[in-house]
Amino acid sequence: MEKTLVILKPCTVQRGLIGEIVTRFEKKGLRLAGMKMVWLTDEILSEHYAHLKEKPFFQRIKDAMSVCPVIVCCWEGVDAIHVVRTLAGTTNGRNAAPGTIRGDYSMSVQENIVHASDSPETAEIELKRFFKDDEIFDYELKNLLSLYANDEF
């Protein structure tokens, strides 16, 4: 099963949407393998957003992501990265389709509810950045056969 990182951003925490967003992923059939609240440091933010370092909005993103703690989650499932990104919707909430998380809860390109890993390579790096090995749990999901055909997992 594929694993991916989701960060519930400060705007999600501030608006009291944590439960609703987690429920969306659970209802889809993803398995929550790890979850914790963390306050992102400047060092972690600089590492996480290093690909945006030269952009004029780099500091604004770091400032927004350190307003309050965030919730980091490890979700698991068949094609979990693609599934999570599809559920999340396009980055700009104003353009995201209704029915997606951003389409339903966001009007912003920055305050867009969640961060989601964009590839298996990125997911591996990001999960190691935010979780220790003993913070990711492997357990049997009792409804697995209700979610997938027996040859899909």
From Swiss-Prot:
InterPro entries attached to this UniProt entry: NDK-like_dom, NDK-like_dom_sf, Nucleoside_diP_kinase, Nucleoside_diP_kinase_AS
GO biological process, any: UTP biosynthetic process
Active site: H115 (pros-phosphohistidine intermediate)
Name the record gives this protein: Nucleoside diphosphate kinase
Annotated organism of origin: Parabacteroides distasonis (strain ATCC 8503 / DSM 20701 / CIP 104284 / JCM 5825 / NCTC 11152)
Cofactors required: Mg(2+)
GO molecular function annotation: ATP binding; metal ion binding; nucleoside diphosphate kinase activity
Gene: ndk
Assembly and interaction partners: Homotetramer.
